[in-house]
């Protein structure tokens, strides 16, 4: 379980409206994520506006990988392009970025979602009250780190058509 592997369950498991259950967990370094047990959620899209990938940004990959291995059976390895990745069954679950310097990573360890977007997304984002914080070269492509008007952080790539 999460707690016996060094993590913390912050919420749940709680019932979800579709009959499943949801919980909020933090890994040993504090990166938070949500787990869901139940039927596959409807409305998951690919392409523009959809999820392009996930990434874990931590100060010490060796400190958290035993947790994810115990909880989900994930392994640390390399994807087909030789990039450090979190793997399961030969497939890439997420990319793993070890960023020890808090000046580059920020003060927190975190999971990030990378979305596919159209080339004018930066302009639309700032016009809607969001902010582009930085550019980053990620395995998913040239990405922008951004926040929505409420401060929630995410990444997007503007190379989708």
What are these regions (language model features)?
Residues 3-50, 55-56, 78-102, 122-161:
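Vicinal oxygen chelate
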Residues 110-111:
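Eukaryotic phosphotyrosine signaling hubs
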């Amino acid at each position: 379980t999460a707690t016996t592997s060094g993590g913390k369950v912050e919420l749940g498991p709680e019932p979800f409206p579709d009959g499943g259950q949801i919980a909020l967990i933090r890994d040993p370094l504090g990166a938070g994520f949500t787990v869901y047990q139940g039927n596959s959620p409807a409305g998951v899209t690919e392409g523009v506006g959809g999820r392009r990938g996930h990434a874990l940004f931590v100060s010490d990959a060796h400190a958290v990988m035993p947790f994810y291995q115990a909880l989900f059976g994930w392994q640390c390895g390399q994807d087909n392009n030789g990039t450090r990745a979190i793997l399961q069954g030969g497939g890439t679950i997420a990319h793993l970025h070890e960023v020890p310097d808090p000046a580059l990573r920020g003060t927190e360890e975190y999971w990030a979602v990378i979305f596919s977007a159209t080339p004018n997304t930066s302009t639309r984002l700032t016009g809607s009250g969001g902010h582009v914080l930085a550019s980053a070269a990620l395995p998913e492509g040239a990405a922008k780190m951004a926040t929505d008007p409420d401060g929630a952080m995410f990444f997007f790539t503007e190379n989708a058509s």
